[in-house]
């Protein structure tokens, strides 16, 4: 008799447990999906919208902080002073965008390991200064979609 009681209680607990757990799980999944969607949208708009255009020097991006002021702007972003000023800001880094690159100045101020400032994607310094003062490296795209822009950085919008 006691065994029947125990098994009945266990069955009731299992049924009750299932009834309660289902909505919580569903809600969690829904919230997770919403959160993921929102996070993805924010990442894309920060990375592509803000980072990739005229204001790329001020942009944040998909990979904020630490290791990237931009993809191959290298590891300059996290370790430089003012990432908002394009590429790697003032401080340099492994592949710094260097100096005031976001405002059209020469990219060699405060170099880094590649003291030309922009061996990658600023197209300056080590690569002979191609486009080094044009809108494609140090002007509108200074540090550009790839440096402090689309792929990361701690720009003013990336904080």
Swiss-Prot record:
Superkingdom: Eukaryota
Tissue specificity field: Larval (posterior) and imaginal (anterior) epidermis.
Coiled-coil residue spans: none
GO MF, one example: structural constituent of pupal chitin-based cuticle
Signal peptide: 1-21
Assigned keywords, A-Z: Cuticle, Signal
Residue ranges of the TM segments: none
Function: Component of the pupal cuticle.
Domain notes: This protein is glycine-rich and contains several repeats of the motif (G/S)1-4(Y/F) like structural proteins from insect egg shells, egg cases and vertebrate cytokeratins.
Protein's recorded name: Pupal cuticle protein Edg-91
Organism whose genome encodes this protein: Drosophila melanogaster (Fruit fly)
Chain's gene name: Edg91
């Amino acid at each position: 008799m006691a065994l029947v009681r125990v098994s009945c209680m266990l069955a009731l607990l299992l049924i009750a447990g299932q009834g309660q757990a289902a909505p919580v799980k569903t809600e969690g999944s829904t919230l997770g999906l919403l959160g993921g969607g929102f996070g993805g949208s924010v990442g894309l708009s920060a990375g592509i919208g803000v980072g990739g255009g005229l204001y790329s020097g001020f942009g944040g991006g998909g990979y904020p902080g630490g290791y990237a002021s931009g993809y191959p702007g290298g590891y300059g972003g996290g370790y430089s002073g003012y990432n908002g000023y394009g590429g790697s800001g003032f401080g340099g880094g492994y592949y710094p965008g260097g100096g005031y690159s976001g405002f059209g100045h020469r990219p060699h101020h405060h170099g880094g390991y590649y003291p030309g400032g922009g061996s990658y994607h600023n197209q300056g310094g080590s690569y002979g200064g191609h486009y080094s003062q044009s809108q494609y490296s140090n002007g509108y795209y200074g540090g550009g979609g790839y440096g402090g822009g689309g792929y990361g950085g701690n720009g003013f919008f990336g904080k």
